[in-house]
Amino acid sequence: RDFCLSRGLGDVYKRQDIYDMTQAVEDGATRPVYYESRVVKLKLDENTLRTIDKEYDLMAAQADQGVIEQSKHELSRMEAILGNDATINTLVTDILDHYENNRENLLTGKAMIVAYSREIAMKIYHRILEIHPDWTEKVAVVMTSSNKDPEEWRDVIGNKAHKNELAKKFKDNNSPLKIAIVVDMWLTGFDVPSLATMYVYKPMSGYNLMQAIARVNRVFRDKEGGLVVDYVGIATALKQAMNDYTVRDRKNYGDTDVGKAVSY
């Protein structure tokens, strides 16, 4: 676990030539972000892991028509793999165990789960409530809606006013809302300083990955740092993103083998 990804991951990296992420932490503007891999907890087989690796390869490829068509096929496979009921059950059980025993969550209990898709976000949500029926105010799904959504989805997702209300509650440290399940929303430009832990169940890379994990690096009271918990093998993509988007951090962490540095 306690492997520091950077000495602070934040929006400051946009000005990387002047103010890199290492400097941000040294100046007290952000907190360190730590990485923990729990991919092994899902007990995914080799074929599944290879499919996930292909997803990262496609992200790195040029978006020509052939790649786009291949991506559609791989996305369909990823949905089936990551949305498997047994895998979701294992995932949620492990997330809850980690959440309830992680000292970083003792401060305010704010955590975010990044789901691969809207369907998977709903599965995670319902599984959490099956385990903890009394958590209806503690956990929420925050994602876009569609007029094709089933009625039961609409009741959970709500309208724009409902999403705005959820945002206010999540930023309020005294609110009972502690866990937000997201897909794309809230991963950029949404700051909750008390947010301590992000559970990642979605392949991400580059700019999008850096923006996402920056959600947990804000300064708050006695918060020592943010924690990114990985369930889909983002380590290599994370290392590459750090090399691409930082200056001094590239020197500090560019040669680090993230996969070996973390503890399981």
Question: Model-found features: residue ranges?
Answer:
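A short beta-strand element within the Helicase C-terminal
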Residues: 182, 186-203, 208-211, 226-230
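Arginine/glycine-rich "motif VI" loop of SF2 helicases in the C-terminal RecA-like domain
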Residues: 133-134, 215-225
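Long, hydrophobic alpha-helical segments
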Residues: 220-264
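Single conserved hydrophobic/aromatic residue that forms the stacking wall/gate
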Residues: 2-13
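Conserved nucleotide-binding/hydrolysis micro-motifs of P-loop NTPases
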Residues: 26, 39-43, 118-120, 146-148, ...
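Beta-sheet entry/capping signal
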Residues: 1, 31-33, 109-112, 121, ...
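Conserved interdomain linker/interface between the two RecA-like ATPase lobes of SF2 helicase motors
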Residues: 15-108
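Conserved C-terminal RecA-like helicase domain
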Residues: 72-182
